[in-house]
Amino acid sequence: MATQTVEDSSKPRPKRTGAGSLLKPLNSEYGKVAPGWGTTPFMGVAMALFAIFLSIILEIYNSSILLDGILTN
């Protein structure tokens, strides 16, 4: 089986951009996970409130909830 060697100088280097330089610090924490539950309970509460909001919108759309003074087609 034939093998091919590639010199390091022949590899194209990624182009540095201003946006990349600004975003690099955000990626420096990649792979690090804080111990414990963190903000998981807050996310659970936010998801529950969003589900309630969506169900209210759906009930209004289906005319399950009638709103006085608001005309719907």
From Swiss-Prot:
Region of interest (Disordered), residue spans: 1-23
Iron-sulfur as UniProt keyword: no
UniProt record, GO biological process: photosynthesis; protein stabilization
Modified residue annotations for Phosphothreonine: T3, T5
Plastid in keyword set: yes
Top-rank taxon: Eukaryota
Record family assignment: Belongs to the PsbH family.
Protein name, per record: Photosystem II reaction center protein H
Species the sequence originates in: Hordeum vulgare
Gene name of the encoded protein: psbH
